[in-house]
A protein has these predicted regions:
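Conserved alpha/beta core of the MobA/IspD/sugar-nucleotide pyrophosphorylase nucleotidyltransferase superfamily
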Residues: 2-8, 151, 155-198
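Nucleotide and nucleotide-moiety/phosphate-recognizing core
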Residues: 5-139, 171-178
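Short beta-strand and adjoining strand-loop segment in the mid-core
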Residues: 88-90, 148-153
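Short glycine- and hydrophobic/aromatic-rich loop-to-beta-strand nucleating segment
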Residues: 141-145, 184-186
């Protein structure tokens, strides 16, 4: 990988506090190919490349596994306040750093190689927001934000996440093409069943 990556303190925030209401609750504990969804997300992280990994969750199982792996376990006691609180908590735990990769737990087909491609794009263009793009042109997760955008991320409210910051700065976004199945997020049990057939 580009040596510039080693010179930048890039942190990762794993967002794992969602209630999964459309799933019927407990979404991140659901299994896919023998692993719980949150474990699959942890396993695609090239953790040796990050200055630190912060996992934001209100679930004891997820927090305990985070600590076991040497990650920072960040408790979100009020997930009902929306994803903005998780972003803020994760951002504070990740500092000091020059960029943060925000990763979600409900994309079970996301591959480590794709995460590496996003990090490599960030190393080559450290001033840009890096976002994966599907074949249909829609942007997905994970997204890499340089420190210049931390104040805007910290100011988010309610159920608004990093996509709001991306929409405010389209000129700053550099996209990395990824296959549709890697960006597909599992909102329902039916979604998970459909992914198992791919």
């Amino acid at each position: 990988m580009d040596n510039k990556m080693d010179m930048r303190a890039v942190a990762c925030v794993l967002l794992a506090a969602g209630a999964g209401s459309r799933f019927g609750g407990g979404k991140l504990l659901a299994e896919f190919s023998g692993e719980r969804l949150f474990e699959r997300a942890m396993n695609v992280l090239p953790k040796e490349l990050f200055s630190r990994v912060a996992v934001v969750s209100g679930c004891e199982d997820i927090l305990a596994e985070s600590e076991r792996r040497g990650f920072l376990a960040v408790r979100n006691s009020a997930p009902e306040k929306g994803v903005s609180l998780s972003v803020r908590l994760g951002l504070e735990a990740a500092k000091p750093c020059s960029a943060v990769l925000f990763l979600v737990c409900d994309q079970p087909l996301l591959r480590k190689e794709s995460v590496l491609r996003i990090l490599e794009a960030g190393a080559a263009h450290p001033e840009r927001i890096i976002a994966p793009e599907g074949p249909d042109g829609r942007l997905g997760n994970p997204c890499l934000f340089p420190a210049a955008y931390f104040p805007e991320l910290a100011a988010l409210e309610g159920d608004r996440g990093g996509k709001r910051v991306i929409r405010a700065h389209p000129e700053a976004v550099l996209t990395v093409p990824l296959p549709e199945e890697e960006l597909f997020d599992t909102d329902t049990k039916e979604d998970l069943s459909r992914l198992k057939e791919i």
